[in-house]
Amino acid sequence: MSEARTAIVTGSTSGIGLGIARAFAAQGMNLMLNGFGAPADIEKERQAIIDEFHVKALYSPADMTKPQEITEMVTAAHAQLGAVDVLVNNAGIQFVAPIEEFPPEKWDQILAINLSAAFHAMRAAVPLMKAQKFGRIINIASAHALVASPFKSAYVAAKHGIAGLTKTVALEVAEAGITVNAICPGYVLTPLVEKQIPDTAKARGITEAQVVHDVLLDAQPTKRFVTVEEIGALAVFLTTPLAGSITGAILSIDGGWTAH
């Protein structure tokens, strides 16, 4: 059982982030959700969490490219929920193209959302966690924090950066009751992955079906997508007392991808 009672999960209006938020809510944690999407859809998911798990579920529209909004989100969570026990940096976007065709503005946007946002959120949350002598920071990286794939220069660079940032902050807060870890999923059939299938097909000159079978699942010896529920269960475990000695870890959950 987790001793954490409150959690911020960025990028939690769909996909992996929503799965983690729901897994936390099932443990009785109150939540600060964050992400983009149709307001009606976001409100539907927020209310579903409240109704199903009987927890508080707030929503912040903070833009992960704007440091001040990220800081204000953390401050609001602390003020309205009473603490920030867990921070999950999950927000992420993707773009697929050869480097000579990669738009510089896409590079900047991916680095801002996939890497810098985690820095700004941790910078705001760590003092609050130090004050209560407890905290769990979970950065959602990727198998691409450990290996590379062509045509994903910004994403791979950002995820490798998340791995380094995770280790550095873990060392800084090791005696403060705070753990910092990165979860590195393989391919999960989320909206983010589904959106990149056509781009990958175009970049490689193959069909979308071939992308799924020969590119995505080819990397994973289990030949199946990792599930959101599996990632949520690992995230929950990292918040429990039994995970207190796990820190600075880069944890693969990738169907054997990085065992190659």
Model-flagged regions — what are they?
Residues 127, 171-172, 244:
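Alpha-helical segment proximal to the catalytic Tyr-Lys
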